């Protein structure tokens, strides 16, 4: 009996030792080499892919390292290649329903993916990636990533066509949440092509950090405490946009994916630069909207919100220097777009010399051009000469003698509905030189065949040396601009423009009455000149006071058009020249089918 019990005890102890040693055998190098070969063979037999592993090492309790791994597709294209993959897990936490990942690290890793029809190609070449002390709570469906780093990355995405953002009707969002302590990026380059819409979209980031983030996959929301991008370089080259492919139709069992909610408490960009360039564009002097290059971009946005088409961007600071030399030093304001419409509130932009402030609000019907959409615009600006010639350098010669800080002042107010807009005021002035004021109304602005409107204006020119400075030398010595007042009004209908304008200087008056049929290209009018002092404008010539009247009419605008017809009948009641007064002069001129005739 004692021997039987002894044998039973030996068997039980042997089984126990065997059960304990079998799991530990996976830490034996020979067993690991055998397991490496078995894994490679199984992947080949089950997927048709080819897996090659240089070295596999597993250390207690669970620290796995795989060196020189290569995974090839059945067509022998590289899907994954890495010099080193390290994974460290605490197995004891599994008993509590948690996966505690002590470390995941990738070194010199290449990933390439191409779908079956080659409309999508994604590749990522990662120098170093690591995450430490991560935790996966299997009971609460929560993932915690306290610290993640990506150093050196080359990411490329090529799309031949875009697919609609849809999900299966039977699918449901995953009930998982992810919390992020810090994500650090350095030396990352991203490139995207989606021809013909996008020729190339390129982004290089020297350093970026994301702090305290929360991702709710079920609620489809992302919340970030702070995002910082330092020394980013962004380049966008749009394509031709001529895609003749037929648009894809959604399958009957798909629905549009609900929008994600993205909230960023603090967004900061420091020392960034950006380029927008049309294909084959040769940059022009000044501000070229086909070639925009911004440098030293500084952005500060607090409480950024986006959910589908809803967006709120409270701009705390925006500064940059454009290639033309325009340097924006300060920008503030809040842009919002939601179901009620769009608005730009408390917007202010400054350069060293200029400033612009604006308040803009429009109802959501602005997107569908609904005539009942309410619209309100308030705009005030001071545009300095120094900034204007940077934007339009071709006018530099016309600003001689003007201080660069001299500024055009404007104050514009509009309100009403899209189908019935009122121009409350449009005041534009150059202090000491001119003042212009206008009011008006326009109806059916978005419908060219139904448009109607009216405009009233007044322009006062002052006796300023500015006019002589902006004229060429050959004219500045001959022409003088005395105090002059321009007034007028115009009425616009779908086919007709009617206008009345007057010019007053001294005791003289010029009145213009005109009509233009825009559809038939027909026009007629009268010009009445009453004692107008030509000598005030041409002081070095021999002309004096002029009184005259002119009638004109015609059809077509181009004199080279064989169907053009025009007549001009000028009657001079009196004109002073070289101290003599001439009266009773008349001049007639006619252009008919390319033939000109006239008489005095």
What are these regions (language model features)?
Residues 1-48:
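N-terminal type II signal-anchor transmembrane helix
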Residues 225, 375-377, 453, 499, ...:
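Transmembrane beta-strands of outer-membrane beta-barrel proteins
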Residues 157-159, 236-238, 356, 388-392, ...:
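Outer-membrane beta-barrel proteins
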Residues 111-114, 195, 532-536, 573-577:
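Sequence/structural signature of outer-membrane beta-barrel proteins
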Residues 314-318, 341-348, 421-428, 495-503, ...:
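Transmembrane beta-strand segments that form the barrel wall of outer-membrane beta-barrel proteins
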Residues 46, 75-88, 117-131, 144-145, ...:
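Amphipathic hydrophobic-ligand
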Residues 151, 230, 318, 349-350, ...:
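Outer-membrane beta-barrel pore domains and translocons
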């Amino acid at each position: 009996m004692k021997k039987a019990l002894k044998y039973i005890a030996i068997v039980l102890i042997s089984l126990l030792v065997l059960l304990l040693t079998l799991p530990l055998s996976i830490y034996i190098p020979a067993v690991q080499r055998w397991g490496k070969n078995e894994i490679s063979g199984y992947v080949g037999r089950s997927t048709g892919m080819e897996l090659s592993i240089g070295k596999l090492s597993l250390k207690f309790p669970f620290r796995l390292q795989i060196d020189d791994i290569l995974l090839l597709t059945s067509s022998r294209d590289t899907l994954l290649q890495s010099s080193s993959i390290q994974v460290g897990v605490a197995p004891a936490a599994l008993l509590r329903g948690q996966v505690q990942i002590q470390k995941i690290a990738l070194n010199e890793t290449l990933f390439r993916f191409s779908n079956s029809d080659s409309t999508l190609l994604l590749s990522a070449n990662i120098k170093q990636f690591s995450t430490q002390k991560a935790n996966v709570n299997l009971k609460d469906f929560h993932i915690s990533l306290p610290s993640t780093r990506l150093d050196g990355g080359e990411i490329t995405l090529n799309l031949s066509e875009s697919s609609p953002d849809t999900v299966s009707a039977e699918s449901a969002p995953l009930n998982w949440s992810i919390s992020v302590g810090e994500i650090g990026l350095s030396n990352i380059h991203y490139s995207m092509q989606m021809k013909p819409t996008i020729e190339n979209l390129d982004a290089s980031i020297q350093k970026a950090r994301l702090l305290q983030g929360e991702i709710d996959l079920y609620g489809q929301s992302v919340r970030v405490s702070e995002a910082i991008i330092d020394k980013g370089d962004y380049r966008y080259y749009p394509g031709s946009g001529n895609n003749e492919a037929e648009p894809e139709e959604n399958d009957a069992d798909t629905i549009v994916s609900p929008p994600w909610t993205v909230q960023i408490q603090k967004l900061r960009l420091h020392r960034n630069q950006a380029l927008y360039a049309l294909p084959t564009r040769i940059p022009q002097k000044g501000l070229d909207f086909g070639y925009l290059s911004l440098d030293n971009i500084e952005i500060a946005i607090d409480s950024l919100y986006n959910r589908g088409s809803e967006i709120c961007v409270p701009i705390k600071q925006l500064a940059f220097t454009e290639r033309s030399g325009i340097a924006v030093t300060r920008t503030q304001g809040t842009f919002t777009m939601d179901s009620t419409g769009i608005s730009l509130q408390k917007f202010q932009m400054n350069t060293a010399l200029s400033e612009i402030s604006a308040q803009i609000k429009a109802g959501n019907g602005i997107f569908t051009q609904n005539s009942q959409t309410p619209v309100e615009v308030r705009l005030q600006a001071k545009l300095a000469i120094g900034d204007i010639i940077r934007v339009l350098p071709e006018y530099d010669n016309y600003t001689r003698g003007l201080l660069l800080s001299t500024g055009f002042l404007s104050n514009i107010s509009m309100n009403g509905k899209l189908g019935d807009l009122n121009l409350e005021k449009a005041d534009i002035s150059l202090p000491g030189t001119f003042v212009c004021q206008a009011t008006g109304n326009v109806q059916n602005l978005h419908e060219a065949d139904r448009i109607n409107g009216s405009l009233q204006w007044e322009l006062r020119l002052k006796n300023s040396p500015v006019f002589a400075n902006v004229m060429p030398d050959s004219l500045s010595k001959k022409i003088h601009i005395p105090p002059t007042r321009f007034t007028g009004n115009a009425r616009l209908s779908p086919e007709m423009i009617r206008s009345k304008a007057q010019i007053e200087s001294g005791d003289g008056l010029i009145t213009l009455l005109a009509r233009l049929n825009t559809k038939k290209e027909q026009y007629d009018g009268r010009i009445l000149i009453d004692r107008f002092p030509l000598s005030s404008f041409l002081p070095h010539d021999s002309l004096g006071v002029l009184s005259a009247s002119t009638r004109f009419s015609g059809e077509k605008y181009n004199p080279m058009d064989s169907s053009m017809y025009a007549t001009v009948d000028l009657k001079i009641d009196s004109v002073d020249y070289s101290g003599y007064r001439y009266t009773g002069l008349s001049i007639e001129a006619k252009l008919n089918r390319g033939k000109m005739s006239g008489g005095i």
